[in-house]
A protein has these predicted regions:
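Long hydrophobic alpha-helical segments typical of transmembrane helices together
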Residues: 186-213
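Aromatic-glycine hotspot motif
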Residues: 53, 64, 136-139, 199
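A generic structural-conservation signal
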Residues: 28, 156, 181, 203-204
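Generic structural signal for individual residues within well-ordered alpha-helical segments
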Residues: 88-91, 164, 188, 201
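GST-like domain detector, emphasizing the conserved glutathione-binding G-site
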Residues: 1-126, 130
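Short capping/connector residues at structural and topological boundaries
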Residues: 84-85, 106, 157-158, 205, ...
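GST-like fold's C-terminal all-alpha helical module
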Residues: 99-196
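Alpha-helix boundary recognition
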Residues: 42-43, 95, 148, 195, ...
Length: 213
């Protein structure tokens, strides 16, 4: 199987981490959705969404669809709880990550990292600062209340909930909007704990090197 998409995307990271945790072999090909003219990518993702999964003659775009497919295709080491309530809660956190955390952080990451680093354009630093001051604190305040002192967001093992939330928080650490232990100690400890897992740590190290190059 092949996964297309740039690893700095939290949605690509989400799939790569899940695959690593489940032991699914994936060939990852770095690809920018805004500039790529790869015919395989364009055929599989007409709206230029990443990541894109290529599984023989089956193509699938969008991280939520991909992780659901991978869970069904490779049920070993489940990342979605089997208990109905826990599964519902895990799906809720996936939705929070995609529709609440990502929009809050995107203005910061896009203006401080994507525009200057990848598109050779100056970012709107005032917009980034305003987003950090107004949009991010409610997100961090909420997560501070719900993350556990030890363990995982849902149930007794790593789940898609932890993968999705942490994948988004990684990008905040890349754009000077990291969780501050003095303000959000539980969230900071949770992030440190989950992001230290080999599935995350390897990707984070690679992205740091890419951003520093």
């Amino acid at each position: 199987m092949i996964l297309l998409g740039v690893s700095i995307s939290p949605f690509v990271r989400k799939v790569l981490v899940m695959a690593a945790e489940k032991g699914i072999p994936l060939e990852h090909r770095q690809l920018s959705p805004t500039t790529s003219e790869d015919p395989l990518f364009l055929a599989a993702s007409p709206f230029r969404k990443v990541p894109v999964l290529i599984d023989d003659d089956y193509h699938l775009a969008d991280s939520t669809a991909i992780v659901a497919y991978l869970e069904a295709r490779f049920p070993q080491t489940p990342m979605f709880p089997t208990d109905p309530r826990e599964r519902g809660t895990a799906t809720w956190y996936e939705e929070v990550a995609d529709t609440i955390i990502f929009p809050a952080g995107q203005k910061i990451f896009f203006n401080r990292v994507v525009l200057p680093r990848f598109l050779n354009r100056p970012g709107d630093l005032a917009t980034a600062a305003e987003a950090q001051a107004t949009l991010l604190p409610p997100v961090y305040n909420y997560l501070e209340k719900v993350v556990p002192v030890e363990g995982f967001l849902v149930g007794g093992s790593l789940s898609i909930a932890d993968i999705c939330v942490t994948s988004m928080l990684v990008n905040m650490h890349f754009c000077d909007a990291a969780v501050e232990p003095a303000l959000h100690p539980r969230l900071a400890a949770y992030f440190k704990r989950i992001s230290a897992r080999p599935s995350f740590a390897r990707l984070i190290a690679g992205d740091k090197a890419m951003l520093a190059a």
